[in-house]
Amino acid sequence: MNVKPEEITSIIKSQIEKYEKKIETVDSGTIIQIGDGIARVYGLNGCMAGELLEFPNDVYAMALNLEQDNVGCVLLGSQEGIKEGNTVKRTGKVVEVPVGENIIGRVVNSLGHPIDGKGAISTTETRAVELVAPGVITRQAVKQPLQTGIKAIDAMIPIGRGQRELIIGDRQTGKTAIAMDTIINQKGKDVICIYVAIGQKQSTVAHIVNNLIETNAMDYTIVVSAAASESAPLQYIAPYAGCSMGEYFMNKGKDVLIVYDDLSKHAVAYRAMSLLLRRPPGREAYPGDVFYLHSRLLERAAKLSDKLGGGSLTALPIIETLAGDVTAYIPTNVISITDGQIFLETELFYSGQRPAINAGISVSRVGGNAQIKAMKQVAGTLRIDLAQYRELASFAQFGSDLDKESKRTLEKGKRLTEILKQPQYKPMAVEKQVMILFAASRNYIMDIPVERISEFEEEFLDYMDTHHREIGDEIKEKQVISDELSDKLRNAIEEFKKIFLIEG
């Protein structure tokens, strides 16, 4: 076989012509210490705060401490198989989560990966976990109601779209139950709900998801779960990830409700991370920026101006207190950040008052502007009536003789307290709330025995549905009780009472 030199020359020439020099520069560093989900890396000189770093075994980390000679970062995955001396690369990106319509109805972890066994989520858009809150000019006042379906809240502590309302109380007082009822009540109201579970037991999250599926609420809900078994960094970013998912819809002009359950565990996870990163501890061993941790999260809840689509993000953060102590560090921080709080009490819970809301110290600072006029008309005196009742009830314990007026106040208070009781997973439409509170506040239930109040309520609402549906429809449509409607409602109550008392 003859090989011509010219052929070899032409092949070499063509190879030289096609040769492309590819130089890829990667800013990399070396792990000098790793343990407890924290790594210290030497050599990442250009690293940004909050940047995503690539570790071996496809594990990523988030840079938090930028020190003179090393970078302190938290691992967003398992540290198994990673050791000192391994190489770490910069990605040049910050931590992002997938966002979009396809996440609705799914259960995801803090990084937006599905954990419900229903396969991958097909979405191309991502959004940074940490983003700056909307500015003053881009917002508008809270003026549209977000109905919870819970009589005590919608009447006395109304919540508006774009508000931050804290749910605070000891463990096992029904905090999550209020949040769940609020989510269930958004059915058909075109509100997207996000439930963020931070440091919860996996069995608890599974129970919540099952309830949402049974009540068909999962059709418009996203569940973000960072269970108690997850590492502190994943628990730390969970609420920010949920918030970014919600902001995507808010920026499209939609209304979003987000529940953070709960921020006490979130602060504990952040404290663990901070102490491992050797940041100086402050009060209750929390780091100095624990206020900023929650304020930058809750400030992202807003009602956007009409120019930006008028979308809203309403936040319901939950805080767990110890023995009712609201003066602890985290509770006082979050109370000062939010626009009001719903305070739940153990004593009320065990005395059968459920939801166990203490109306005396629960408040909504901006929700009053969002409350519908019909509710204002019937619930205006409710808080004062209950306050007078509580004051008299504690006085009456001593067995002193009471005058007629005081006895009447006590009797009315007992009935109002009974009316405000409500079973779980049974949120009530606002027009029904208005009708029953109209009967209660206008003294139409004074001759009904206390033990028959719940029976009266149920049968009265059934009666109104069957015989006077137009009254409920008018309240729903016009959101105000005119003199004419008031007379119709009075007559309907009188009619029903005759039947009820005869049957009784």
From Swiss-Prot:
Q: Which Gene3D superfamilies does the record associate with it?
A: 2.40.30.20, ATP synthase alpha/beta chain, C-terminal domain, P-loop containing nucleotide triphosphate hydrolases
Give the enzyme class: translocase
Alphabetized PROSITE patterns for the sequence: ATPASE_ALPHA_BETA
Kindly state which reaction or reactions the protein catalyses: ATP + H2O + 4 H(+)(in) = ADP + phosphate + 5 H(+)(out)
Annotated positions binding ATP: 169-176
In alphabetical order, the GO MF annotations are: ADP binding; ATP binding; proton-transporting ATP synthase activity, rotational mechanism
Q: Report membrane topology.
A: Peripheral membrane protein
What keyword terms does UniProt attach to this protein? ATP synthesis, ATP-binding, Cell membrane, CF(1), Hydrogen ion transport, Ion transport, Membrane, Nucleotide-binding, Translocase, Transport
Q: Where is this site: Required for activity?
A: 362
Q: Which InterPro entries match?
A: ATP_synth_asu-like_sf, ATP_synth_asu_C, ATP_synth_asu_C_sf, ATP_synth_F1_a_nt-bd_dom, ATP_synth_F1_asu, ATPase_a/bsu_AS, ATPase_F1/V1/A1_a/bsu_N, ATPase_F1/V1/A1_a/bsu_N_sf
Pfam families in the record = ATP-synt_ab, ATP-synt_ab_C, ATP-synt_ab_N
List the GO terms this entry assigns under cellular component, sorted alphabetically: plasma membrane; proton-transporting ATP synthase complex
- Top-rank lineage group of the source organism: Bacteria
Cell compartments where the protein resides:
Cell membrane
E.C. number: 7.1.2.2
State the oligomer form and interacting partners: F-type ATPases have 2 components, CF(1) - the catalytic core - and CF(0) - the membrane proton channel. CF(1) has five subunits: alpha(3), beta(3), gamma(1), delta(1), epsilon(1). CF(0) has three main subunits: a(1), b(2) and c(9-12). The alpha and beta chains form an alternating ring which encloses part of the gamma chain. CF(1) is attached to CF(0) by a central stalk formed by the gamma and epsilon chains, while a peripheral stalk is formed by the delta and b chains.
Q: What does this protein do?
A: Produces ATP from ADP in the presence of a proton gradient across the membrane. The alpha chain is a regulatory subunit.
Question: Into which family does the record put it?
Answer: Belongs to the ATPase alpha/beta chains family.
Q: What is the designated name of this protein?
A: ATP synthase subunit alpha
